Curated annotation (Swiss-Prot):
It is found in: Golgi apparatus; Cytoplasm, Cytoskeleton, Microtubule organizing center, Centrosome; Cell projection, Cilium. The gene is Rpgr. Residues 679-691, 717-731 have a biased composition (Acidic residues). It comes from Mus musculus (Mouse). Residues 976-1001 have a biased composition (Polar residues). This is X-linked retinitis pigmentosa GTPase regulator.
Length: 1001
């Protein structure tokens, strides 16, 4: 206690908040030895303090010489202006870039910027030292000074008001002048008692309590009806305030008025500076600030975009723009306040003077010396107390501030170098009368001075309980007690109770099987997120750890159940979007390709898995037949699951701060599905580059499963995410459209019966840049030849597939048809079916010529019900088929060898299709679009890809590779088509970040 009393003497200290040069963005304080401030004034970025010994101290920015020290260098410590010592300074006022001073002898001095003649020296030359304004004589006893952006005002004891400087908006009340370089009297025929200059408007109060405003009329800052705004260059009375006005304060775009009973505000309030709440950002009608109408306000001050109110009890309320911490609500609270908020830091002090500037605030306060009954403060705390609510008996110097610290700023404090931490400490008292002082008054608010004679002899503090005077000092210093709070706080609450800086996690109680909804601290970036995940078993509480184990067991059980039924989960490619391209992608063609398809080995990889793929072909075929056999079982289960899978899959906004707990729960379920498929895909041989991507995906999925925290991306990652989110807004609803869910589910099951017919040699999911266009002939040749070869290689499985083809619906696309469709995307179902018809007819003709299979004819005619243009395009295709018939036989062997090699085998295709059956809650049209992206030709050139665009509508709906099948075997195709897909990833607005693909449709 004794130490704290020595830090803050009984005479009080000047507390600084915001951007003050004295302590940038860090609350600090200083005091004068054997002296006290009697006047504080804040400019845009500089400050003036007048002490009881009639000394002037200045500090802050000095670009125009506004500090009057003979130079233009900024001053970080309060510095006494020795040139004015003989004059005995009495008042000071700071404008945006100039300073006014008055002395006991009646002299008025000015220094700083003078571009509009605001120094009153008869010219427009800047001054870096104080020069006397000769207009004023000792007979003019100055009562008050005020300064605005480029304006100045002086009020005499006899009620005369003089103004000079810029009058471009009529802010000095001279109707017919643009600006004046010497003082001119402004009168309304009544003596004036108070003056305040804002940035571009001004206001004064007459002796009988009437309020007059003039200057810039925008935003309602004058408080006048529209019909009176035409005369805004002349003072006009504000009739909307019936009570007697005592004080007025003008800010950058708002005005605050103190009457005998209440406080009014009007003007611009987008930062909350009106104190009228979040639903009123501008008003020309004076409004009562209801939140503090029960408090007896004795002084008001306005900064550019914030406001401060002082009560007779010495309490301080602030509201408005919270940047730089200028509201004095704590180092962690830089948020805007839309209602008057009690500065709990000053509960142990009695506030005596306040001043608001452009980006800072100064408060002079003394320790409370007496005792006070607690009931007197009861109405003060709720609901307007600044960051926490606690009783006056619970005001320990450390806990009160620390409990309101946000996690983000607590981390910022920990990362701050030790040298900056020392700035928080109190500077030693300045020696003698030359002690430095920092006090702020806003340019648009009149300086608030406290004469020595008026220093409260019997202030409310006499009846107050003695409180620790080191209360504020300890708040300014970071204490390790915050980080080392109870284990429960650090684990469950993220070391903060600031609801704006917390998210929540649901965990399952091991004993009662209930959901515990506990807040957790959000992480700042992906690296931090991963580190926390790695240490989760060591740091989380027991319930969280048990939940993690139960989730893993549940995951294995679900996987086994799906495996027994022939239903497989497909891993969403979206999970890998948290990684940068450099971390995962290796191909030169890759730019922003989804990582799940990255492949660094190029076309050479086509020989890697050939042998192993051929060895397990029979096993894959068996699995396919089993999947078709359990169609009815899946059909019943799918009806209940179809509405949930796509919602469970995370979208690209899964890491946004505004995501709610529902999205978190859905993300956890998506992670479980991803993990299920990841474990199975390890059975298939893949290039090292792909396996690396898979490991990243598994790790990422596991981390999301262990603790589904929201992630704060770094600034670069956030920008990328935001850009992607903007592009996806238009189509996000399409992914969750459930209008055709039942129809799609039925079609999906029927489609599975077509799979045994094809070996699915080509399954890369290719996308085409919108700019690409190409001839149709070259594409048609390649398509026909590869279709013929694919059909021949699958002849041995035709017997079992005939029945399936007969039952297929008209809108189902087989895997063989999908390759051509994969190169295009159509926004209409009719357009899709036109393309489907083309492909089917080609298949029909080719099989009639080669095999004479009737079922192929049936298949080819399936989708023709959707459009008439199909037949015309089909005729052109038939001609191309006839021309290439002869060359087809020559290419058989090469194509067979090529087709047997790649990655798209029955086993992989069935897994993808089965997983899509689970996710079948998208409309049929959406699935068809995605199916059309399945690339059936691994070597289709970009020129060939252009054909597919010409035969369809524009490509605004091309989806990124994440929207296509994430086949584990896609090796060659990934590199061949990466460029086009990457372009789509970053440009097309319809690229949902969903990792959902429709293999079947």
């Amino acid at each position: 206690m004794a130490e704290s009393e020595s830090l803050v003497p009984d005479t009080g200290a000047v507390f600084t908040f915001g951007k003050t040069k004295f302590a940038e963005n860090i609350p600090s304080k200083f005091w004068f030895k054997n002296d006290i401030p009697i006047c504080l004034s804040c400019g845009d970025e500089h400050t003036a303090i007048v002490t009881g010994n009639n000394k002037l101290y200045m500090f802050g920015s000095n670009n125009w010489g506004q500090l009057g020290l003979g130079s233009k260098a900024a001053i970080i410590k309060p510095t006494c202006i020795k040139a004015l010592k003989p004059e005995k300074v009495k008042l000071a006022a700071c404008g945006r870039n100039h300073t006014l001073v008055s002395t006991d002898t009646g002299g008025v001095y000015a220094a700083g910027g003078n571009n509009e003649g605001q120094l009153g020296l008869g010219d427009t030359d800047d001054r870096d030292t104080f020069h006397q304004i000769v207009f004023f004589t000792p007979a003019d006893t100055i009562k008050q000074l005020s300064a605005g952006a480029n304006t100045s005002a002086a009020l005499t004891e006899d009620g005369k008001l003089f103004m000079w400087g810029d009058n471009s908006e009529g802010q000095i009340g001279l109707e017919d002048k643009s600006n004046v370089c010497i003082p001119h009297e402004v009168t309304v025929g009544k003596p004036i008692s108070w003056i305040s200059c804002g940035y571009y408007h001004s206001a004064f109060v007459t002796m009988d309590g009437e309020l007059y405003t003039f200057g810039e009329p925008e935003n309602g800052k004058l408080g006048l009806p529209n019909e009176l705004l035409m005369n805004h260059r002349s003072p006009q009375r504000v009739l909307g305030i019936p009570e007697r006005v005592i004080q007025v304060a003008c800010g950058g775009g708002h005005t605050v008025v103190l009457t005998e009973k209440v406080v009014y505000a009007f003007g611009l309030g987008q930062f909350g500076q009106l104190g009228l709440g979040t639903f009123l950002f501008e008003t020309s009608e004076p409004k009562i600030i209801e939140r503090i109408k029960d408090q007896k306000i004795c002084h008001i001050s306005c900064g550019e975009n914030h406001t401060a109110l002082m009560t007779e009890l010495g309490l301080l309320y602030t509201f408005g723009d919270g940047r730089h911490g200028k509201l004095g609500l704590g180092m962690e609270n830089f948020t805007n306040q839309f209602f008057p908020t009690l500065c709990s830091n000053f509960l142990r002090f009695a506030v005596q003077l306040i001043a608001c500037g452009g980006c800072h605030m100064l408060v002079f306060a003394t320790p409370r010396l007496g005792t006070i009954d607690e009931p007197k403060f009861e109405d003060v705390y709720e609901p307007y107390i600044s960051t926490g609510s606690f009783s006056i008996n619970d005001l320990s110097p450390r806990s009160s501030l620390n409990r309101s610290l946000s996690a983000r700023l607590r981390r910022r404090e920990r990362e701050r170098p030790p040298c900056s931490a020392s700035m928080v400490g109190t500077l030693p008292p300045l020696e003698g009368t030359s002690a430095s002082t920092s006090a702020y008054f806003y340019p648009s608010s009149p300086p608030f001075h406290l004469s020595v004679n008026n220093y409260p002899e019997k202030s409310p503090s006499e009846s107050m309980e003695p409180l620790d005077s080191d209360y504020f000092e300890d708040k300014m210093n970071k204490d390790t007690e915050t980080e080392n709070s109870s284990a429960v706080d650090s684990e469950n609450f993220g070391e903060t109770n600031d609801i704006l800086n917390m998210t929540h996690m649901m965990t399952t109680s091991s004993n009662e099987k209930l959901l515990d909804f506990s807040p957790i601290q959000k992480q700042q970036n992906q690296d931090t997120f991963e580190k926390v995940m790695e240490s989760t078993p060591c740091t989380e509480n027991e319930d969280s750890y048990e939940y993690e184990e139960m989730s893993k067991i549940k995951e294995v059980t679900v996987y086994k159940q799906y495996l027994a039924k022939g239903i497989y989960m497909i891993r969403p490619a979206e999970i890998l979007e948290a990684f940068s391209d450099e971390e995962v992608g290796n191909g030169l063609d890759q730019v922003e390709e989804p990582r799940v398809f990255t492949d660094g080995k190029g076309l050479q990889s086509k020989q890697v898995g050939k042998e192993s793929d051929e060895e397990i072909v029979s096993e894959k075929k068996t699995e396919v037949m089993e999947v078709a056999d359990v169609k009815k079982i899946r059909e019943s289960e799918e009806n209940s699951k179809s509405d949930s899978l796509f919602d469970d899959l995370p979208d690209k906004t899964m890491n946004s701060e505004s995501e709610d707990n529902k999205d978190i729960a859905e993300e956890r379920r998506s992670s479980e599905q991803n993990m299920t498929f990841d474990s199975e895909t390890e059975l298939v041989e893949e290039p090292d580059s792909y396996m690396e991507c898979e490991r990243h995906s598994e790790q990422d999925s596991a981390e999301e499963l262990e603790q589904p925290k929201l992630v704060e991306y770094s600034s670069e990652e956030k920008d990328e995410k935001d850009e992607k989110d903007d592009d996806e807004v238009e189509t996000e609803n399409l992914w969750y459209d459930r209008n055709c869910t039942e129809q799609e589910t039925e079609n999906v099951f029927r489609a599975t019966r077509f799979f045994p017919k094809f070996d699915l040699k080509h399954d890369h999911l290719s996308g085409i840049p919108e700019e690409q266009e190409g001839p149709e002939d070259s594409e048609g040749n390649v398509v026909v030849e590869q279709v013929v070869q694919a059909q021949k290689e699958n002849l041995e499985f035709e017997g079992d597939r005939k029945e399936a083809k007969a039952e297929a619906p008209s809108d189902v696309i087989t895997e063989k048809e999908a390759p051509q469709l994969s190169e295009t995307v159509k926004p209409e179902e009719g357009e899709m079916d036109e393309e489907i018809s083309i492909l089917n007819v080609e298949d029909t003709v080719e099989e009639e010529r080669k095999e004479g299979e009737k079922e192929i004819v049936e298949e080819g005619s399936i989708p023709e019900t959707e459009g008439s243009e199909t037949i015309d395009i089909t005729d052109e295709k038939l001609d191309e088929v006839l021309k290439e018939e002869d060359s087809a036989s020559l290419l058989q062997r090469a194509l067979r060898e090529y087709n047997e090699n790649p990655k798209g085998h029955m086993y992989d295709r069935v897994k993808s299709s089965s997983s899509e059956i689970l996710g079948g809650n998208d409309p049929t049209s959406k699935d068809i679009k995605k199916a059309k992206k399945i690339s059936f030709f691994n070597r289709m050139s970009l020129t060939g890809q252009k054909l597919m665009q010409n035969t369809n509508d524009p490509l605004p709906e091309i989806k990124p590779i994440g929207d296509q099948i994430a086949l584990q075997s896609d090796k060659k195709d990934a590199n061949q088509n990466h460029m086009g897909q990457n372009l789509q990833d970053s440009t097309t607005p319809n690229m949902e970040g969903k990792s959902k693909s429709c293999t079947i449709l």
